[in-house]
């Protein structure tokens, strides 16, 4: 019998940095990349399942893809308040999006109703090395400051796409396995 943990995960960051693209490529097993940009208005909910290796367990991630536009901020902050997991993203070719990471982390922490988040900071567009403005080291240092794990990804090249989701699912599973709570859901 498979144990399935269900958990809410907020995906946040500035507009037009690749949040939706990363989710879509992950959900379609790296076989689909959205060719045209379509701004997320408010929040889009997607569900992705991660099987935990060497177990019969799986984690269903309820991915709240939150718009990075200020006009939707009040709405999205309410929706991510009770999300135990979070992905904060920035564009490695866009230094202002990186500078805004600490603001996103502060908003996430300030509006949390479920304590500290398990999180990943993801540097997007890692394939565009010639246009890069933020180094891997800078990303790692920022992740350390906000208490998150750091990864880089390219949704377009389907590189590093699964890792953020597998990391969060594994950490969530580990937390619940240690507590003996594998039948509990957190939505």
Predicted regions and their residues:
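TRAFAC-class small GTPase G-domain
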Residues: 1-184
